[in-house]
Amino acid sequence: LKEEPHAMLSNGGTATFERAKEVPITMIESGPVGGVIGAAALGEIIDEENIITFDIGGTTAKTSLINKGNVRITTEYKLEQNPRFAGYPVKMPVVDIIEIGAGGGSIAWIDDVGVLKVGPKSAGADPGPACYGLGGKEPTLTDANLIAARIDPASFLGGEFKVSLDLAKEAMAPIAEHFNIDIEEAALGVIKTANNNMLNALKLISVRRGYDPRDFTMVGMGGNGAVHGPFLASELKVDKLIIPNMPSTFSAWGMLMTDLRQDFIQTQIMPVVGCDLDRVNAIYEEMEQEALAIYTKQGISPEDVVFARSADLRYIGQEHTVKTAVTGGKIKEEDLPVIRQAFDRNHHQAYTFSLEDAAAEFANFNLTAFGKVNKPDIKTVCPSGTPEAAYKGERIIDFDEQG
């Protein structure tokens, strides 16, 4: 390799393999994070600063929110969190992603009380959905989309992979028999159930965070983003849905649009009013010098390093914290009320209330250091050909508009 390889990190940046292997926990969920960073880069290109990302693959669906061009980073991320499991707290900077077990390979099944469920168990890629003809016998979301003709069998994987409608219907038959409905209706029920699960995730990342989805543009990616995106956007009253070119590999493209990034955290609990400003400034100075030393070792000049400061604040007595931006340079006494007011606003945004009269404290001081690197040039694609030349054929598709 002519250039040194880098690893994608869960904080939305990249690092050398040597740096990444020192703290491997920083690579958790780094693949999906690439899609979020790609969506932010795409938004900058097309002048869309408010974006909801939705990445639907074979096993899971993941969503994140970009507000005013800023990707939300959290230290409260919990691995494998779901309604029945609290998850494993990572306590490292991670792009804020909500993940559910709903993807193309998610298996449709009937629970003990006779209710239709989709996921989280997945058929994966091997044997995969029944329609693959590789031995899978259980009905999946992909089988349902094929039965509803929302997937074109002639164009699956560019026409290189043949899928079987008969095998999909055979797998869906037990679901239809259980509810005494036809197979096509059962397939639509599977799709609706999966869409409802996905909608819950989208609401968690937007409405539950205090954001109105109608103020955002949706970017659908992954192998199933274009299949389910239109229905999800319609339910959320999102006016614009963008499907990037080659959505299945969009996360990889997003990785190419990242800078080097290092996150530093110093835990130091002290009240906002009457805090030791000399100590606070020393903490940030120490972290900045450490970052510069790391990047200098990697051949990055100080002129190409950009710092972003923040702090995790909370009302005294609280367990959870809220990240709040802190201005660069030496922090003075007159800066503290500004930081406190920003914290109150952020807390109200996240939890719908703030306690302006309550005492607040710093819990962590954070520094993000970006090392600027060259990125691919994005070329404008000019329209060519005629609409007639783009015609591929016709088929009847069940969109269930009346259901």
Identify what each model region corresponds to.
Residues E48, G58, I66, G103, ...:
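C-terminal, non-catalytic interaction/recognition modules in large multi-subunit enzymes and RNPs
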Residues P5-L9, I28-S30, I52-F54, T63-L65, ...:
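General beta-strand structural signal in soluble alpha/beta enzymes
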Residues L1, G13-I51, K78-V95, G103-G105, ...:
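Conserved phosphate-binding catalytic cores of ATP/NTP-utilizing and phosphoryl-transfer enzymes
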